[in-house]
């Protein structure tokens, strides 16, 4: 938003977009995710998040468009990120019982939430300054977004490996 010459007032429409997506699509996507299965949806959710960062990287070398179109990169980011999250959250909760016994199920759900929060915090602390390099339109402005895309992409690959045993029924 800042790169596009926007301000805090431009956050409102983006929050409305995210809220609208959740209101309209959270339940249908959760049903879809459960029908397809967490084993397949977890990698897809992480890939959507990776693509959200890639979408901003694609716009980074160009001067921002005029008018409301200047928010297009942010709208793409919010849409893809939110959709990825709407797939990941129910799928992630669905796989927790695979790793936990009945007695420790609550602790495992708490650990899942804590791990997500810690990942966001660590990402902001370690990579937040990197985004300052993305403020001026240039080819170099793509790199911070590409770096950020690597982490959910690696998570998607990890989910393929981690979830492989879940494709077979437990004995």
Regions found by a protein language model. Give the residues of each.
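A late C-terminal transmembrane helix in Major Facilitator Superfamily
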Residues: 103-134
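Short amphipathic helix-loop junctions that connect adjacent transmembrane helices
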Residues: 1-11, 132
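Multi-pass alpha-helical transporter architecture, strongest
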Residues: 146-171
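C-terminal ends and interior cores of transmembrane alpha-helices
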Residues: 47-67
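Hydrophobic core of transmembrane alpha-helices in multi-pass small-molecule transporters
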Residues: 67-87
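Helix-to-loop junctions at the C-terminal end of transmembrane segments
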Residues: 24-39, 131-132
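A membrane-interface helix-boundary motif in multi-pass transporters
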Residues: 129-153
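Intracellular juxtamembrane helix-capping segments at the cytosolic ends
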Residues: 87-101
């Amino acid at each position: 938003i800042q790169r596009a010459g926007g301000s805090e007032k431009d956050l409102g429409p983006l929050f409305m977009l995210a809220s609208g997506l959740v209101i309209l699509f959270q339940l249908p996507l959760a049903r879809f995710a459960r029908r397809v299965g967490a084993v397949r949806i977890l990698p897809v959710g992480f890939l959507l998040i990776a693509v959200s960062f890639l979408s901003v990287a694609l716009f980074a070398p160009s001067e921002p468009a005029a008018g409301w179109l200047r928010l297009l990169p942010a709208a793409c980011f919010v849409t893809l990120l939110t959709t990825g999250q709407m797939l990941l959250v129910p799928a992630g909760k669905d796989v927790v019982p695979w790793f936990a016994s009945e007695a420790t199920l609550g602790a495992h759900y708490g650990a899942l939430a804590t791990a997500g929060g810690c990942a966001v915090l660590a990402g902001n602390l370690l990579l937040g300054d990197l985004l300052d390099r993305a403020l001026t339109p240039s080819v170099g402005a793509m790199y911070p977004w590409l770096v950020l895309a690597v982490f959910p992409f690696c998570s998607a690959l990890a989910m393929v490996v981690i979830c492989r045993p879940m494709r077979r029924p437990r004995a």
